[in-house]
Amino acid sequence: MEILSNNAALKAVIMDVAEVAGHIWVKGWGERNGGNITVRLTEFATPEWAPMPALSDPIAIGCELPHLRGHYFYAKGTQKRMRDLARDPMANGSVIRICDDCAHYEIIADSAVMPTSELPSIGLGISQLPISTLSLMIVFTCL
């Protein structure tokens, strides 16, 4: 299932991420494979997402993030370049779901691209924020 089909709002967000990645590349802010982009997608999730089979085994986050149970994120793929993400975001990143145990995530779309590893810092950094503050969260870090 292509997760962007029939979800114009989600597609617009992912295309915005691609545009930002293009700017990061052009400005030289993300060296080679450096830099992470993660966007919270939970508000764009549809009922069809919950039963979607995982494309990966559960992957350990490195800490427990109970406030993010069941949340969805788009994350740039590890070893993926910003310029390539700008051209084809779903081939250079993936949509992940935080598992019910809050200590693992699984890749659900569109391909099994291993995401960058900033989830523990994102989760710990926002643990004190009310969920309403998290309606759209974008994180970019340079290495």
Which residues are covered by each model-predicted region?
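An anion-binding catalytic pocket shared by soluble metabolic enzymes
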Residues: 4, 11-130
